Structures are given as structure tokens and as C-alpha cells.
Regions:
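Ferredoxin-like alpha/beta domains used as RNA- or RNAP-binding modules
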Residues: 1-97, 124-170
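Short glycine/serine/threonine-biased micro-segments
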Residues: 96, 111, 117
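Short, well-ordered loop/turn sites that connect or cap secondary structure elements
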Residues: 103, 109-110, 129
Length: 170
């Protein structure tokens, strides 16, 4: 499936984001884009926020639109439901657990098949994790330097629980 391969700092500069949100510890030397201080219309503000959400979560337009359509069909506040759907993506959960430094790295760890959900290997980054699912690192992948390095640097959010010894999460 397609994904955005545009340079991270360039895109952050365009959207006015801090690269540290994405786990990138670099800064752009060029500052903001020209005309960054101009007043945006309401539509421009909405579009910019949508583009930020798409970029941060690494989702393409068509997939984002499908999630939006599903959120509008469900009962509740559409924006909150959309963010819940984005947060429950497998690659995002791996990032939140601290098994990777960035969402892009989490996507790669998932696509290379280093993880299991409920004992079954899942290599689809957009898989929506359900409440009660058990995520584990495969036996062959427990010695990966990337995973060991990332575990020591992150704190896990309250809606997830992580066992560092067994390398499993709920």
C-alpha cells in the first residue's frame, strides 16, 4: 500500500508542527515557510488540521476518509471517534507502547512481522486493536536492538499496560 515518503522536516515546516511530536530530534534551520503568518480562512484551518492528523498518524487520504465515514455513522462525537480509530491502529499502539521511537519505525516493525496479536502474527499496520487483545513480540524478534533501545526511552499511556520482562501488552 502507498505511504507518504516526503521528508519529515519539510512537511513539519509546511504544517507548522514541531518535529519532536513525531519522535524526530532534529530542527529545520530554515524556520517557517513564507506566508506562514497570513490569516487562514475557516476552510484553510480545517484543511491544515486534517493534513496534520494525516501526517502525524501516517495515513493516506483515502484511508483517512474511510475512517471519517465510519466515525460519522457511529453514535457520538465524530472527531473524538475518528481520533479513537486512529489511536487504535496497530502501528500507533506499538509507538504508544514504546516499542519504537517513531510511528514510521513502528509501521516497519509491524510490516516485517516482528509482533503477534493473541498469538497470531499480524503484519498489517492499519489493523485495529481491540480492547483485551494481547500484543507480544515474537520469540525470534526479542533480541532486536531497535526494540530493546526503544523500550528504555518511553512511558506507556494509561489505557495500555506493558510487561517489559515478557515483552507483551494489553
Amino acid at each position: 500500500m502507498a505511504r507518504d515518503r516526503q521528508p519529515v522536516l519539510k512537511k513539519c515546516r509546511t504544517l507548522g508542527l514541531d518535529p519532536s511530536i513525531l519522535g524526530v530530534n532534529k530542527k529545520s534551520k530554515r524556520g517557517l515557510r513564507p506566508n506562514a503568518n497570513r490569516k487562514l480562512t475557516d476552510y484553510g484551518i480545517q484543511l491544515r488540521e486534517k493534513q496534520k492528523a494525516r501526517f502525524v498518524y501516517g495515513v493516506m487520504e483515502k484511508q483517512f476518509y474511510k475512517l471519517y465515514e465510519e466515525a460519522t455513522r457511529k453514535d457520538g462525537v465524530t472527531g473524538e471517534l475518528l481520533l479513537q480509530f486512529l489511536e487504535r491502529r496497530f502501528d500507533n499502539v506499538i509507538y504508544r507502547l514504546g516499542l519504537s521511537n517513531t510511528r514510521r519505525q513502528a509501521r516497519q516493525i509491524v510490516s516485517h512481522g516482528h509482533l503477534e496479536i493473541n498469538g497470531r502474527r499480524v503484519n498489517i499496520a492499519s489493523y485495529r486493536v481491540k480492547q483485551g487483545d494481547v500484543i507480544t513480540v515474537r520469540e525470534k524478534s526479542k533480541d532486536l536492538a531497535i526494540i530493546k533501545e526503544a523500550i528504555n526511552q518511553k512511558s506507556v499511556p494509561g489505557w495500555l499496560s506493558f510487561d517489559e520482562n515478557a515483552l507483551s501488552a494489553k
